[in-house]
Amino acid sequence: MIRVFNTLGRRKEVFNPYSPPLVGMYVCGPTVYDYTHIGHARTFTVFDAIKRYLRLRGYDVFHVQNITDIDDKIINRAREEGRDWREIVREYSRDYLEGLGSLGIQIDHHPRVTDHISDIIRFIEGLIEKGYAYVAESGSVYFEVDKYPGYGMLSGHLSKEAWRQEEDVLHEKKSPYDFALWKAAKPGEPSWESPWGRGRPGWHIECSVMSSRYLGSRIDIHGGGVDLVFPHHENERAQSESYFGHRWVRYWLHASYLTIKGEKMSKSLGNIIPLREALREWGPGPLRLWLLSSHYRSNLDYSEEALGQYRRLYERLRQAADSIGRRLERAEPKGRLGEGELETVERLKGVVRRWHEAMSDDFNMGKAMSSLWEFTTIYFREVEQTESYTLLWLSWRILTGFNSVYAFAPDIVEARRPERSLEDSLVQALVDVRSELRRRKMYDLADEIRSRLAQLGFVLHDKGEKTEWRRR
């Protein structure tokens, strides 16, 4: 049984999707007006891991994550830089998608706002027809907040003083708390034809339309950063439930902030770290492990010390993968396990059990991460020297199970599977030749083979008369 913390109600609930095993998950993606930073990456990696864990548990998850490619921020950036807004979108969309690819984040569909203008117009027309929206003299369209009685329940902002938005257009609203569904065109800004004149969508309507376009009128998980709870998700919920006439999202999940020395990243403080720089410094595997090292609802504080710790964990996991793959090639299944081996089996099973317990409890990734450390300790202390096929195969299954969720090394399942590849066979042949040269005391040639293999990324370890190797 999986339990998740639902922001709507602020309590843990048993995970029970609308139509199991199908799960529809929508995550609010970026507004592409600047480079993706590690705060964005934290949110996107968290929801990728949640999706992967649900798939591991047998759910068929369809993951939609939008790209907001028209917005005030994009228009302002284009104006500041004297560039066409579409150039801004292309540059920062590319940066975002490259960052996701490097982190192994797999999105099933990436809808863009500008590809759904007609869908947005139809949705707004429906809200007007149902009496939840009205057209102002300027041609802008607003959602009438007072018509939706549940407004404020998601965020807890039940006092109207917290709702005030868009001060510059107060004169044309029925209430200062109403928010824009469609913004009338301004000179020099991109716009599209609509029944109310030229204009462009408001921010909140975009996600309501794109999520329901691909996931239907009932969505299992709607996620994003905690900073989106109000007003963005509050407004999404209001307009969507008004349009559909029933509960829209079953579980609202929100990832907390990534901080630096306890402070939220911000341009004013000058402490933003672009994702591309973090990837260049730490590599995708260690970075991804670190991004998943705390509970997603808790802040994650950046420090080089912490990242160094997860780089070491990454290296241990890679070493374990190489070690298991090599040993499985020569290990032979045998009969009954010895008492010590049975005890190791139980310890490994305990690692998996505790990991599932943590992940099933609102995807407690911080607690679950301890199981990866524990696994490497047990493997190198108890399994590596046994040559036990059963223990090696169990270790392999555990490691690849972890990797299917954490995705710290996407190549492990394919390139490190227990079957020997041609490359592995050639390296092993050279290692065997070197061992024979050492036996004959032809150390110069043996050292030359070690040196050449090191240049190719293979590290040799001599243990008495035996030599083991791994990829660097």
From Swiss-Prot:
The keyword Cytoplasm applies. GO terms for cellular component: cytoplasm. ATP binds at residue 267. It holds the Pfam family CysS_C. Belongs to the class-I aminoacyl-tRNA synthetase family. Keywords: Aminoacyl-tRNA synthetase, ATP-binding, Cytoplasm, Ligase, Metal-binding, Nucleotide-binding, Protein biosynthesis, Zinc. This is Cysteine--tRNA ligase. A motif ('HIGH' region) lies at residues 30-40. One of its GO terms (biological process) is cysteinyl-tRNA aminoacylation. A motif ('KMSKS' region) lies at residues 264-268. It is found in: Cytoplasm. The keyword Transferase does not apply. One of its GO terms (molecular function) is zinc ion binding. Binds 1 zinc ion per subunit. Its main location: cytoplasm. Its cofactor is Zn(2+). NCBIfam families: cysS (TIGR00435). It is an enzyme of class 6 (ligase). It catalyses: tRNA(Cys) + L-cysteine + ATP = L-cysteinyl-tRNA(Cys) + AMP + diphosphate. HAMAP family: Cys_tRNA_synth. InterPro entries: Cys-tRNA-ligase, Cys-tRNA/MSH_ligase, CysS_C, Rossmann-like_a/b/a_fold, tRNA-synt_1_cat_dom, tRNAsynth_Ia_anticodon-bd. Zn(2+) binds at residues 28, 207, 232, 236. It comes from Aeropyrum pernix (strain ATCC 700893 / DSM 11879 / JCM 9820 / NBRC 100138 / K1). Its EC number is 6.1.1.16.
